[in-house]
From Swiss-Prot:
InterPro entries: AAA+_ATPase (IPR003593), ABC_SmlMolc_Importer (IPR050093), ABC_transporter-like_ATP-bd (IPR003439), ABC_transporter-like_CS (IPR017871), ABC_transpr_FbpC (IPR015853), P-loop_NTPase (IPR027417). GO terms for cellular component: plasma membrane. Transmembrane segments: none annotated. This is Fe(3+) ions import ATP-binding protein FbpC. Residues 4-236 form the ABC transporter domain. Its EC number is 7.2.2.7. Part of the ABC transporter complex FbpABC involved in Fe(3+) ions import. Responsible for energy coupling to the transport system. ATP binds at G36, P37, S38, G39, C40, G41, K42, T43.
Length: 360
């Protein structure tokens, strides 16, 4: 039995369906990320789980307790759920210590000790407990918000895009630190984000939301390498989608014969490769006289961005499945290491590693 069960959840705002039949199971102590474009319903779902609003239809069950069943709902303060918002939502007139201990009873003899302990757990020095929120950095404020949420010993932690306002480097380190803290505490966690890389790196389970319901739920690896459809493939990362015919575990495509993840046979199909599966090796036009199954291209664009370089490669020879000519005239967009990326005008040999995914 799942720790959190969501079944058939619906929510309307007037004629607009914010949620249109959401189902989700979350295991105890796990981390789940809900990712999707703005307006897809992910924040509405978080508000219903937290108890800030009630669903029109559907059930929410947490650790065997029914929190919501249609319009009947347990109040937010009785759910045992912690929430960390995007801006931290700290009280500006309170000290950091009082922010962390806001939900604790004033008469608790161990209140001060617990506040110091929580500050230590989230990586804050006790010296800052007498400061005000405006005296802290964005990363420190988010740690305070997390400590405040953990102070109530929640059964479930909800993170509503808590890292989006942080600088890129700090965002990555904070995400890793928060994941480790929550895992060590054994707290089941749901992260809502519009950042695909954040969702894939943070969670053991990722749910892609579109138009008020989940399009696909699974492990980060399965969603990235075996997306259900083209929309999910392109939403989760750069995608190379090619026409192909499938037979005997291989695809005949504009990039040649490529191993695929199915043994089905199809005359017409679409396959997915990720740009990192395409290898490049410098050569010359004279070096293009290899075996017939070799594929060559010319670099037509190169955009340096430090550690990475985005390059466009126009195929110079391609194979002959349907639409091959059109694909041959469309450059492949690839990301390679910025240290030794080929320059515009260079000739490269292309190779494919791993298997391509065949869309169902």
């Amino acid at each position: 039995m799942s720790f959190l069960e969501i079944k058939g959840l619906h929510k309307h705002y007037g004629p607009v369906a914010a949620l249109a039949g959401v189902d989700l199971d979350v295991a105890s102590g796990s981390r789940t990320a809900i990712v999707g474009p703005s307006g897809c319903g992910k924040t509405t779902l978080l508000r219903l789980i937290a108890g800030f609003e009630a669903p029109d239809q559907g059930r929410i069950v947490l650790d065997g307790e029914v929190l919501a069943n249609g319009g009947a709902a347990v109040p937010a303060h009785r759910r045992g759920i912690g929430v960390v918002a995007q801006d931290g939502a700290l009280f500006p007139h309170l000290t950091i210590g009082d922010n962390i201990g806001f939900g604790m009873g004033r008469g608790d003899d161990k209140r001060a000790e617990r506040i110091v302990e929580l500050a230590y757990i989230v990586g804050l020095d006790k010296a800052i407990l007498k400061r005000r929120p405006h005296e802290l950095s964005g990363g420190q404020q988010q740690r305070v918000a997390l400590a405040r949420a953990m102070a109530m010993k929640p059964r479930l932690m909800l993170l509503d895009e808590p890292f989006s306002a942080l600088d890129t480097g700090l965002r990555a380190s904070m995400r890793k630190a928060v994941a480790e803290l929550l895992e060590a505490a054994g707290i089941t966690t749901i992260l809502v984000t519009h950042d695909q890389a954040e969702a894939l790196s943070f969670a053991a389970q990722v749910a892609v939301m579109r138009d008020g319901k989940f399009s696909q739920v699974g492990t980060p690896r399965d969603l990235y390498l075996k997306p259900k459809d083209r929309m999910i493939a392109e939403f989760l990362g750069d995608a190379i989608i090619l026409p192909a015919s499938i037979s005997g575990g291989f695809a005949n495509s504009p990039l040649g014969r490529i191993a695929v993840d199915t043994n089905d046979s199809r005359d017409v199909a679409r396959i997915l490769l990720r740009p990192e599966q395409i290898g490049l090796k410098r050569t010359s036009r004279e070096g293009m006289s290899g075996t017939p199954d070799m594929l060559f291209g010319e670099v037509t664009e190169s955009e340096f961005a430090g550690s990475t370089c985005t390059i466009a490669v126009r195929l110079l020879n391609n194979f002959d499945p349907p639409d091959a000519a059109a694909i041959g005239n469309t450059p492949l967009i690839l990301r390679k290491s910025g240290m030794d990326a080929p320059a515009v005008g260079e000739i490269v040999r292309l190779t494919v590693s791993g298997k391509a995914h065949v869309f169902v």
